[in-house]
């Protein structure tokens, strides 16, 4: 249960260097043996019937206790045939004007009817019909707010959405249906919402865990929800005392999402929060190679490998699928030094819920 919280959130927009929003709130698994009978001098043998009960008792089902915060989680409360209608409260561009693409932070009302958790997703059904005259299909988006929302009253849900616009092979400009629908919303506009869904990216229960977050672009969404709960909120039943380490990869510095928020968290929690950016078009490593997220991680390779050997280290990866191979390449050589097959070890981490991936 969340107690009173207070946090200043800076969301840069194209019209001003930052939008400062003051947020304060009050919260929200028989064997019958052979028998002889003596009668005078004649012995009468009575052969006993031997029966054996071969029915086996059903095996006891062992329920594996999850290391994640799954208690009371709700999934698929709202389905495509009966979605929840949310209303847009806020829609702010959070990338600079010179960024390669627009990303928007969108806040919807839920009136407490969509009980999501950090790490879950919701679906959005855009208005209109497709070329076949049928309603558009839903698109899933990772939730970018903590369970009590940006306003701390458990009545909103936030998304981080990049506007999809590209030129196809025929030279035509193509716009993503749902992303453009969302990025064009004005306060007061409605949107059909489904879900919540997902358990893969739920936070670990252990408040002393090491949580390594690897995100590219809008893959930052679930990690913003994690970090708000850890560092911007106060809860009676949860206080994070571990280490949160965020690696965020983007093409340009004007594409860094929620930068001011994260820097404020780091300033106030220097012992519990580490923050590393990888800006591929502006930064290089000592070899002159572009600074992708795996390039930045390579600078801390030995330290990361030591953390991955611990039972209370959890890795979460969200964003572009391409970063997976680069991260594997780093870990293969490190694990080999200890005589460990990295790909097999990663499977063990997945089974123990310590390696969690949501890429696209």
UniProtKB/Swiss-Prot annotation:
Its EC number is 1.18.1.2. Heterodimer with LFNR2. Interacts with PGRL1A and PGRL1B. Interacts with TIC62. Component of high molecular weight thylakoid LFNRs-containing protein complexes containing LIR1, LFNR1, LFNR2, TIC62 and TROL proteins. Interacts directly with LIR1 and TIC62; LIR1 increases the affinity of LFNR1 and LFNR2 for TIC62. Binds to YCF54 in chloroplasts. Belongs to the ferredoxin--NADP reductase type 1 family. Expressed in shoots. Restricted to green tissues, being more abundant in siliques. It is an enzyme of class 1 (oxidoreductase). This is Ferredoxin--NADP reductase, leaf isozyme 1, chloroplastic. The modification Phosphoserine is found at residue 179. It is a peripheral membrane protein. Residues 81-203 form the FAD-binding FR-type domain. It comes from Arabidopsis thaliana. GO terms for biological process: photosynthetic electron transport chain; regulation of tetrapyrrole biosynthetic process. GO terms for cellular component: apoplast; chloroplast; chloroplast envelope; chloroplast stroma; chloroplast thylakoid; chloroplast thylakoid membrane; chloroplast thylakoid membrane protein complex; plastid. Plays a key role in regulating the relative amounts of cyclic and non-cyclic electron flow to meet the demands of the plant for ATP and reducing power. Probable electron donor required for the MgProto monomethylester (MgProtoME) cyclase complex reaction to form protochlorophyllide, thus connecting chlorophyll synthesis with photosynthetic activity. One of its GO terms (molecular function) is protein domain specific binding. Induction: By nitrate. FAD binds at residues 139-142, 160-162, 166, 177-179, 218. Pathway: Energy metabolism; photosynthesis. NADP(+) binds at residues 142, 162, 218, 250-251, 280-281, 290, 319-320, 358. Keywords: Chloroplast, Disulfide bond, Electron transport, FAD, Flavoprotein, Membrane, NADP, Oxidoreductase, Phosphoprotein, Photosynthesis, Plastid, Thylakoid, Transit peptide, Transport. The modification Phosphothreonine is found at residue 210. It is found in: Plastid, Chloroplast stroma; Plastid, Chloroplast thylakoid membrane.
